A protein has these predicted regions:
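Conserved functional hotspots at enzyme active or ligand-binding sites that engage polyanionic ligands
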Residues: 1-95
Length: 95
């Protein structure tokens, strides 16, 4: 993510995820603008934020263990997370 040696992710799963106490599903955040990416604005953050213009790739979803998360940059509004999760579901064939 820019000059940093980490990539931010947005958690898109909830407590119904198997082993939710150990891991969750995350969508990748990037500084690369793409037509299908979800732009994050200051209004999308409930707290915190990112230092550069950022976009979520809802087609790049990975399972990450909580122990592997270094720190939180902020938290997104529920409506923003729901929008990202809904778009991610579309890439999985859920309509």
């Amino acid at each position: 993510f820019g000059d940093a040696d980490y990539r931010p992710y947005v958690c898109v799963s909830d407590d119904t995820h198997p082993f939710s106490d150990e891991e969750a599903l995350y969508a990748a955040v990037t500084t690369t603008q793409r037509d299908a990416a979800v732009l994050l604005t200051d209004d999308d953050f409930a707290s915190g934020g990112l230092p550069r213009d950022s976009y979520v790739n809802p087609w790049t979803v990975v399972s990450i263990r909580h122990a592997d998360i270094d720190h939180a940059e902020g938290s997104l509004a529920d409506e923003t997370i729901e929008r990202i999760a809904s778009e991610a579901a579309g890439y999985l064939g859920v309509r």
